[in-house]
Amino acid sequence: MILSLDRQIPLSTLSEINKYIHKVKIGYPLILENIEYLDDIVKLHWDEIIFDLKLADIDNTMVLIVSKFINYADSFIAHSFIGIEGALDKLSEFLKNQNKSLYLVLSMSHKGWNDEFYPYLKNIAKTIDPKGFVVGATRPNMIRIVRNDFRDKIIISPGVGAQGAMIGDAICNGADYEIIGRSIYESKDPVTETKKIIETQEVKINECKRTEN
């Protein structure tokens, strides 16, 4: 599981959550809210810190943006629809030289996203060869398609909980990690809610495994 943080929560609470969730995705709202809070996040023991900047610009602009946060993040998220030449090619090259990773968005979780563009995005993804992809948990069919097309890539899936996708469904359809944010940090007891979500996910995954067998 990946914790999605779009706003600041008490560091003591985050530290407790970090005992159960070892990857975190940082959104623009949190970056704009308190840049100093990022220093506190980095001090915790995360396996991966992902900056969700949804980069979608020319190469020079994107490189300048990620350069500002290169010491905070292990990975960055960019849109794939912007294309390769003069955009993702240079961004990918820069991140690799910095020993950082790239995730490309292939399918978003909101209703307005159009998956008819997927064949175009798939070709871009094959050329750029990123660490992995963002595919909305609300689109299980797309998760299955992307998993079939990219068997060795990591799929991370937002949209669980607040956006309607059920806990565990994305994993059952081929995702590696589900991204959960508001269901945790907007709850009255984020740590307890984290434990409940993990338990629910484990039950769902075990059910899927039994069904497959």
Curated annotation (Swiss-Prot):
CDD domains in the cross-refs: OMP_decarboxylase_like
Keyword Lyase: yes
PROSITE patterns: OMPDECASE (PS00156)
GO CC field: cytosol
Residues that, per the record, bind substrate: 6, 25, 52-61, 109, 158-168, 181-182
Entry GO MF terms: orotidine-5'-phosphate decarboxylase activity
Reactions it catalyzes: orotidine 5'-phosphate + H(+) = UMP + CO2
Pathway field: Pyrimidine metabolism; UMP biosynthesis via de novo pathway; UMP from orotate: step 2/2
InterPro entries: Aldolase_TIM (IPR013785), OMPdecase (IPR014732), OMPdecase_arc (IPR047595), OMPdecase_AS (IPR018089), OMPdeCOase_dom (IPR001754), RibuloseP-bd_barrel (IPR011060)
Keywords attached to this entry: Decarboxylase, Lyase, Pyrimidine biosynthesis
SMART domains associated with the record: OMPdecase
Active-site feature positions: K54 (proton donor)
Top-level EC class: lyase
Single GO BP term: 'de novo' pyrimidine nucleobase biosynthetic process
Any Pfam family matching the protein: OMPdecase
EC number, as in UniProt: 4.1.1.23
Oligomeric and partner information: Homodimer.
Family: Belongs to the OMP decarboxylase family. Type 1 subfamily.
Function recorded in the entry: Catalyzes the decarboxylation of orotidine 5'-monophosphate (OMP) to uridine 5'-monophosphate (UMP).
PANTHER family linked to this entry: OROTIDINE 5'-PHOSPHATE DECARBOXYLASE (PTHR32119:SF2)
Protein name: Orotidine 5'-phosphate decarboxylase
Organism: Sulfurisphaera tokodaii (strain DSM 16993 / JCM 10545 / NBRC 100140 / 7)
